[in-house]
């Protein structure tokens, strides 16, 4: 059942909770929200079955969490703080954050901003170099497209460093209209990715253990020589 929490600026954030136990918040990436991403909902149910209270939420500007542009990383972190307060009943207890794709950089930024986080878990975190010095060019171009109301251009700018066939496939897919609708909500994704390029990497990555291949493995090793790497089966 959908519940709502009110963020610092009054925006209502829609979410579901599955199970009970230590709290885990699932932070979606670029195109993810509950009605558009059944796989994350399935994962929430799976984790709940292993003794966790799992929050799957619609990020600001998506699904049942409507908001006007511009949508900032700071606002997105405020939304996570509101969810955390709701889960812990204001006790400031720590929560685990699972970040998928660019949701990983948002989760990392939230932890760096002081959100009480017990664990950070990333899946396919795109934390390699973004275009332009410190990601600034990438972010500036996206913001320019959003400010102009150019939703097609926003998606094209965001996907500019991805294989061209991914963008063409998206344009031909039934979900393209939904992607256009939520395009302004990509700004926090871009802002957080740019932030990872300008932050103190050794501090950000020193406690990271990676499971799988690049880019996270390479980035962690370059930032902190004792970073661990492992591969999980299944």
Positions of the model-derived regions?
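Conserved HGGG/HGGXW glycine-rich cap/lid loop of the alpha/beta-hydrolase fold
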Residues: 4-66
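Short hydrophobic segments within beta-strands
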Residues: 26-30, 98, 212
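Short amphipathic alpha-helical segments and helix-helix/interface helices
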Residues: 41-45, 84, 143, 183, ...
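Alpha-helical elements of Rossmann-like donor-binding domains used by nucleotide-donor carbohydrate transfer enzymes
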Residues: 42, 75-82, 141, 153, ...
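Active-site loop/oxyanion-hole signature of alpha/beta-hydrolase fold enzymes
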Residues: 45-49, 56-95
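Conserved hydrolase catalytic core segment
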Residues: 92-131
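Helix-rich cap/lid subdomain of alpha/beta-hydrolase
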Residues: 125-177, 187-194, 204
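Conserved serine/cysteine hydrolase catalytic core
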Residues: 175-221, 227-228, 232-234
């Amino acid at each position: 059942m959908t519940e709502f929490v009110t963020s610092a600026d009054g925006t209502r954030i829609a979410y579901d909770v599955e199970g009970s136990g230590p709290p885990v918040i699932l932070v979606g990436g670029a195109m993810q929200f509950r009605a558009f991403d059944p796989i994350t909902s399935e994962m929430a149910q799976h984790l709940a079955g292993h003794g966790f209270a799992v929050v799957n939420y619609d990020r600001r500007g998506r699904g049942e969490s409507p908001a006007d542009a511009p949508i900032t990383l700071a606002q997105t972190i405020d939304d996570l703080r509101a969810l955390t307060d709701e889960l812990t009943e204001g006790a400031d207890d720590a929560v685990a954050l699972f970040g998928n794709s660019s949701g990983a950089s948002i989760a990392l930024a939230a932890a760096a901003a002081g959100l009480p986080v017990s664990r950070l878990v990333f899946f396919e975190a795109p934390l390699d170099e973004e275009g332009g010095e410190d990601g600034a060019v990438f972010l500036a171009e996206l913001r320019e497209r959003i400010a102009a109301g150019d939703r097609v251009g926003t998606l094209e700018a965001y996907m500019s460093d991805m294989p061209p066939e991914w963008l063409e496939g998206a344009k031909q897919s039934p979900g393209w209209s939904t992607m256009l609708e939520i395009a302004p909500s990509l700004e926090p994704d871009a802002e957080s990715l740019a932030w990872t390029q300008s932050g103190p990497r050794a501090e950000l990555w020193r406690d990271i253990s990676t499971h799988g291949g690049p880019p996270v493995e390479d980035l962690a090793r370059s930032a902190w020589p004792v970073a661990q790497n492992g591969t999980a089966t299944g």
